[in-house]
Amino acid sequence: MASSARFSLVYRHIGREYLLSFLVAFFFFFFIFFINQILLIAQRILLKQVDYFSVLQLVLLSIPQFLLYTFPFSSLTASSMVIGDLSGNNEILAIRSSGISLKHVFIPIIIISLAFSMLTFLTADKALPWSTKKYRELYTDLMRDLPTLELMANSTNTIANTVMVNKGVEGNTVHDIILFETSSVRGGQILSAPKAEVSLYDLQSFIYQLELDNPLILKSETQGGWALSKAESAQFFLNFSGQIASIASALPSQLSIKELQQNIQEHKIALQAEKKRYQEKVQTLELSLAELVDKAKTDAEVSVSHIEELEVQLKQLKDQKPINFYYQYYRAELHKKYALSAACFMLVFLTFSLSFFRVKHGRLIGFGLSMLVAVVYWYLLFFAQMQIFSLSISPALLIWSPNLLMFFGGLLFLLHARRL
């Protein structure tokens, strides 16, 4: 009974300190990683004179995609700060002197980190897809009300078959505008105007009307000539349906587990068909090469260079094994959701070896070490994502490699520290 009470006291103390440190770390990472991007979103929308409530909604709906990294790094930092503080204040020494194993210090951290892993998984699988859908619906509604929402000042915008260059954008007014036509019907036509007003023309098709003031129209003729005309005003129509389509489609990282699995299955079938065609090409080329080699044994007129050419083609074909871009991409994003969720639990093992060292300012030292580990983990995960398109191996191995490296590295450090 007394032993159980001692463990309970340790669990409550460690758990409370871990949760408080997690809260501090969570707000730190939230502001460091995300407040700048949130302010950029708010600034971009506010400059378009969108109401404050809509801006607030967009900001809130953007938060779940940031939480996927906030939870793992906060869990790591909290564990590092707590264990560093306990070691620095000799609390670890006191616990060990009382005959309590260090595993009872680690148990509450592991259990709470597992809860954070589950919370991260729910964010990735439920909250992120839902918030993305609502974000795109709201943004689409704003585009209906404000046509220039997708038009940035001092920028170049491609809208359907039209390339638009403009300077200032104020409300529905666009200044110093130049329009380049790239369609086959009116290719080579250029329009310019000092000012233009954008207004909604067709709500269902997202077509907007551009009222040009004092436009100049330059048209290139097919025979090499050109024509220049001027008018007091002109009407031009912009088709924003392409922009709406891109907004309405979610990125693979914003899909749920179920949606990712469905897309993976579709692209797996496509990859299998591609591999079948690839094998047929290889077999056809090998057969042609074998026939040519057999023929060369009896026919001296067979060109040796032709045989060498086929051998080179066969070697190049075997080196270029088919890789389905989307099959790799969707599988990588699926495992990334699991890996980031598991990181809340796996990264804390790197901090356990700190319990065997007594350092001054242990909380600060732990915080600094966690920052270093977070940067290394971020880099490894980013590097692994870049390799999924160039390597034909399973994306699961690449995406999980940073987690496994950190986890087993933590176990090795812990075993080594115990022997010191």
Model-derived segments and their meaning:
Residues M1-Y11, I45-F53, Q316-N324:
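Short, membrane-interfacial amphipathic segments enriched in basic
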Residues H13, E17-S21, H104-S117, D125:
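Start (N-cap) of specific transmembrane helices in multi-pass transporter permeases
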Residues F53, Q57, S113-F237:
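Non-transmembrane, extracytosolic/lumenal segments of membrane-associated proteins
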Residues I63-V82:
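Long, hydrophobic alpha-helical segments
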Residues S79-L93, S98:
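Transmembrane helix boundary and interhelical loop/hinge segments in multi-pass membrane proteins
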Residues R96-S101, L391:
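Short helix-to-coil transition segments within interhelical loops
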Residues A290-L334:
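Membrane-proximal, non-transmembrane alpha-helical segments
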Residues P322-H416:
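Transmembrane alpha-helical segments that form the functional core of multipass membrane systems
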